[in-house]
């Protein structure tokens, strides 16, 4: 039994860390497509092709259920994958769903009409590709009415985090928050719509101010996955061991990942 976790780089490790803590008995196979990162500047067809290739690799590892722990892939590829590509005995889940459930306080299976929610002004921080897809706004509109979403494409942040340049990453986050607040001075909530961003959560919160509720994905996804597997245990796949795979240089990626999570992580070539 194993569950696959995919990201274009290292950001998905924030999700992996949370799901491992929540489900310690489940083996997880992590696949980082570091050779092609970042996805946030690629076009939708490119993202679709790369995401399908990574998903197939995780299926080959015995993971019948794959989590796209990458907002760009979830936004630009998942809908198309679910409509035309995923076989009936497999499942691929994105990371938007738990966020929208938390924001709208309604479950995913709730198909009642959209309704008013408490939060009216939402700031979305994400990669340029995620912002361009408008996937978050589309999914939110199915569930809530009267919510104003202001999206800020956060160019450069993922690269700075992947390169371990914390000072640059912090400066970029502050600059992106300032840019958004010029358009939406008083957001009630902020969505960190990239799995790299939880590492910068304190900086986002500080720049936004204490009155803004910041939604970060890792723990929300972990709770959602635990709930899903309780309802659908047949999708815990045949794999039996946890491992870390990368399309990049395993040694370099292992070193960065170890810095990233502050515990030893060893990647092998995918």
From Swiss-Prot:
Keywords: Cell shape, Cell wall biogenesis/degradation, Isomerase, Peptidoglycan synthesis. It comes from the Bacteria. The active site is at 70 (proton donor/acceptor), 194 (proton donor/acceptor). One of its GO terms (molecular function) is glutamate racemase activity. Provides the (R)-glutamate required for cell wall biosynthesis. HAMAP family: Glu_racemase (MF_00258). This is Glutamate racemase. It comes from Cereibacter sphaeroides (strain ATCC 17025 / ATH 2.4.3) (Rhodobacter sphaeroides).
